[in-house]
Amino acid sequence: MPELPEVEVTRRGVAPYLEGQVVSGVVLRHTGLRWPFPAALSQTLAGRTIRSTGRRGKYLLIHFDHGTLIVHLGMSGHIRILPLGVPPQKHDHFDMTVGNQVLRLTDPRRFGAVLWHAAEEGAVDQHLLLRTLGVEPLEGLFTAQWLYRQTRSRRSAIKQVLLAGDIVVGVGNIYASESLFQAGINPKTQAHRIGLQRYERLAQAIREILAAAIAQGGSTLKDFIGVNGQSGYFQQNYFVYARTGEPCRICNAPVRQIVQGQRSTFYCPNCQK
């Protein structure tokens, strides 16, 4: 699933093509993805100017004066910017034409979403999917003190707390495993048992790993590509994720794989305590 770095890479890729431009048309090639496409979406967007782009966790936000288009890439989605006239393929479900370019959403498994939040409904942060999200890990509110305070009553494993998204947002399965490794924290440790000093290491690791992943175009494991069609390459730098049985890059102990909350977790039993 595309995580925060992949969505931020996508946002930065589409922004120069969208911001300040007028939408000339929308094509929907299915009734919807995870949820139905909004009614009359073509009429809602046609002729309207895109003011800016944003991101909240794993959601791409495209802002207009009269509302915000909310896009989620789901498990297997990606967005490309293409010239006019490029024929759609089987899994190309949404096109938005801007100038002489087309923003095209491809989603083979159809777990993504394209939703509309009208301005009269209030701030987009109050949308049902966004209102309970935690702080952004690359912004100032995200600190070790925040993690420490918010986890005093959390008896769940720290890996599952990171994935929940209500304390810190956008840290998915890949980057949670990698961040916990860099911080030296066993993913099975109950969150409330972790002290402030260890949260200092974890907060720093999350920031550094997410920033590095963005700089390297995200991770391409199966489906994700950037808007220009290029793959990310952060996966070349994984220390533990998807390296079951391979030697730890630090101590040579075999990397272990366990299941937490129906998700695979990867860690080094020697380096992570």
UniProtKB/Swiss-Prot annotation:
It comes from the Bacteria. It catalyses: Hydrolysis of DNA containing ring-opened 7-methylguanine residues, releasing 2,6-diamino-4-hydroxy-5-(N-methyl)formamidopyrimidine; 2'-deoxyribonucleotide-(2'-deoxyribose 5'-phosphate)-2'-deoxyribonucleotide-DNA = a 3'-end 2'-deoxyribonucleotide-(2,3-dehydro-2,3-deoxyribose 5'-phosphate)-DNA + a 5'-end 5'-phospho-2'-deoxyribonucleoside-DNA + H(+). PROSITE patterns: FPG_CAT, ZF_FPG_1, ZF_FPG_2. Transmembrane segments: none annotated. GO terms for biological process: base-excision repair. A zinc finger (FPG-type) spans 239-273. Pfam families: Fapy_DNA_glyco (PF01149), H2TH (PF06831), zf-FPG_IleRS (PF06827). The keyword Thylakoid does not apply. Coiled coil: none annotated. Its EC number is 3.2.2.23, 4.2.99.18. GO terms for molecular function: 8-oxo-7,8-dihydroguanine DNA N-glycosylase activity; class I DNA-(apurinic or apyrimidinic site) endonuclease activity; damaged DNA binding; zinc ion binding. Its cofactor is Zn(2+). Gene3D superfamilies: 1.10.8.50, MutM-like, N-terminal (3.20.190.10). Binds 1 zinc ion per subunit. DNA binds at residues 91, 109, 154. The active site is at 2 (schiff-base intermediate with dna), 3 (proton donor), 58 (proton donor), 263 (proton donor). Keywords: DNA damage, DNA repair, DNA-binding, Glycosidase, Hydrolase, Lyase, Metal-binding, Multifunctional enzyme, Zinc, Zinc-finger. Belongs to the FPG family. Monomer. Involved in base excision repair of DNA damaged by oxidation or by mutagenic agents. Acts as a DNA glycosylase that recognizes and removes damaged bases. Has a preference for oxidized purines, such as 7,8-dihydro-8-oxoguanine (8-oxoG). Has AP (apurinic/apyrimidinic) lyase activity and introduces nicks in the DNA strand. Cleaves the DNA backbone by beta-delta elimination to generate a single-strand break at the site of the removed base with both 3'- and 5'-phosphates. This is Formamidopyrimidine-DNA glycosylase.
